Amino acid sequence: MNSKFYHRSRLFLTFGEASEIWLSTLSPLTRKNYASGIKFLVSLKVLDLTKTLDNAISFDHSESLFKIKSLTIFNGKPVSEASKQARAACYISFTKFLYRLTKGYINPAIPLKDFGNTTFFKIRDRVKTVSISKKEWTVFFEALRLVSYRDYLIGKLIVQGIRKLDEILSLCMEDLFFASNQISFRIKKRQNKEINIPITFPFSLMKELKDYVGGRNGRVFISEDGSPIATSQVVHNFKIAALRSAMTTKITPRVLRASALIHLKQMGLRDEEIMRVSCLSSKQSLCSYVCSGGNSSVANIPTIL
């Protein structure tokens, strides 16, 4: 089939069909956020999922972006600037995908940079995440161990490995290397690409993990019935442990990771090393935490538990 005709034929896909293809290429968390963004754009009548892509050839993207950024109230609730920028980012990312999908028949949206009408601008310098000290997370882990030994191990991996919760819940037995005290984390990047981040953990933590998994196969962390763990289960047990340990701070997986990042920075670990193991994209991203409170080589993080 003629290549040009093949890519033109994709113009007869509906926006709904194209969005499903696009979302399937994204990491789980990004997919969830952008799926919500697509629903928002449909509600705002920026997108009509029943129409075919050939309608997008004549789209005035600047008008669509202006409509998104001009919104002040949605469903009776105020719309924050952060929310508007997130929806605009979703729209731009989707049109870039359509550009690739149709090999240029549909032009991608370009962020507006007109004075007073800029699509993206810095809202805040710091990530709105509280943090706790090493002493506090030690007390928290003692309580969490009694609530759920499984989630106690998850929490310690978050802190020592500077990992996100979904990266830990997706671990399988073949990712554990007890002989070398290493765990290999699969990190989803854009375009459905994946990199491996091998991290060395303290022997004591790996021994606890080895005793927990025994001789099982499949996922490392599972529910009592053997099914995958929902993030809400972990968050719930964290909440119980925080109450039992009389913590005044709400402890979430995000708070633990942010606390570990700040602690490593305070220890004097180089920014480049922290960025490499945490997968933060820039020093600016790292600074937003520390100011608030392919394959990779093996990362040796100082023991901070």
Swiss-Prot record:
The active site is at 188, 257, 289 (o-(3'-phospho-dna)-tyrosine intermediate). The keyword DNA-binding applies. Pfam families: Phage_integrase (PF00589). It comes from the Bacteria. Keywords: DNA integration, DNA recombination, DNA-binding, Plasmid, Viral genome integration, Virus entry into host cell. The keyword Plastid does not apply. InterPro entries: CB, DNA_brk_join_enz, Integrase-like_cat_sf, Integrase_catalytic. Residues 13-99 form the Core-binding (CB) domain. CDD domains: DNA_BRE_C. GO terms for molecular function: DNA binding. GO terms for biological process: DNA integration; DNA recombination; establishment of integrated proviral latency; symbiont entry into host cell; viral genome integration into host DNA. Residues 127-303 form the Tyr recombinase domain. Belongs to the 'phage' integrase family. This is Virulence plasmid integrase pGP7-D. It comes from Chlamydia muridarum (strain MoPn / Nigg).
